[in-house]
From Swiss-Prot:
Pathway: Purine metabolism; IMP biosynthesis via de novo pathway; N(2)-formyl-N(1)-(5-phospho-D-ribosyl)glycinamide from N(1)-(5-phospho-D-ribosyl)glycinamide (formate route): step 1/1. Coiled coil: none annotated. This is Formate-dependent phosphoribosylglycinamide formyltransferase. It comes from Bordetella pertussis (strain Tohama I / ATCC BAA-589 / NCTC 13251). Its EC number is 6.3.1.21. Residues 125-320 form the ATP-grasp domain. It catalyses: N(1)-(5-phospho-beta-D-ribosyl)glycinamide + formate + ATP = N(2)-formyl-N(1)-(5-phospho-beta-D-ribosyl)glycinamide + ADP + phosphate + H(+).
Amino acid sequence: MSTFPAPVLGTPLSPTATRVMLLGAGELGKEVVIALQRLGVEVIAVDRYADAPGHQVAHRAHVVSMTDPQALRQVIEQERPHVVVPEIEAIATDLLVALEDEGAVHVTPTARAAHLTMNREGIRRLAAETLGLPTSPYRFVDTEQALREAIDGGIGYPCVIKPVMSSSGKGQSIIRSADDIAAAWRYAQEGGRVGAGRVIVEGFIEFDYEITLLTVRARGADGQIVTQFCEPIGHRQVDGDYVESWQPHPMSPVALQRSREIALAVTGDLGGLGIFGVELFVAGDQVWFSEVSPRPHDTGMVTLISQVQNEFELHARALLGLPVDTRLRQPGASSVIYGGVDARGVAFEGVAQALAEPGTDIRLFGKPESYAKRRMGVGLAVADDVDQARAKAARVSQAVRVRA
């Protein structure tokens, strides 16, 4: 019998409050804030710019450069949260590791998970070299000349180049011949989160599709940690950024089982409690590990309409030590609403038309500034099957017009 104490939740803004600090207050962080507040948690949201989506709904908000360890330590010591939840990758994770080692704070899922996954080198070496999981062939290089040598030395064409520290497709491109190398190298150097630096070059896998397998480590009623899986999420990307997702994505039983085994291995090693977005390539019954995010995943926004508990509720419950329910309610899809204009304080037209069809919903993120390819919202839909849901979600997002 487990001796783990049952979670006790306090009252916000009182001496009994359970305080959670989110590092990153974008659209995903905003939904986590809402999920936590529904459970009576006092939430502090931190981001690098004012009036971020999560700032608008948190009990308190701070504007901090989260890559500055001194500034980050100061806000953590000021607020004294019980739990720190990294919601983005651009964080001084060395500090989180040190604070967790000191016993000063608990990081969800773990400080080590946040540290390893902020850098493609850390998580790729863990997956491929420590855990022995199947991945694309890869090399890490620091110069354009080393990139050429890696390609000629076995990676071959076509191949994919990415900064070791970037997100949302920034700095990522496909190299199809030697003529592409110089431009791809420059683009990768411009797209890194911390400026120019190291890149990963990967051999191209001829996959049929890619999925996100949302994997949840949570405590059951007996206090034991159990790993549970959501139904696989299919998605389409343009320039490395997701434009639509759907759930469930059809898979062979063998591929689904192998996907779960890979996800179990990597999340089990990272440890802790919470949701992980495990990205996988699939060809027939073969599965390759790609990446993992120890937090809700952008493609998982479909779960806002498709699941009994969406990915944000799952993360909130898990990090608080509560049981979760990963069941699918109905096939669903999400479709991104882009800004389309460069402006502050935009207005949204066509919302009534977007919501006129039964089984639809939208989320407008409330970002203070729009630009052409910035994700400003998402259209959501459910239907009898994913094809119908995708078509319906696309109609929702297309109906919404952004006006400066």
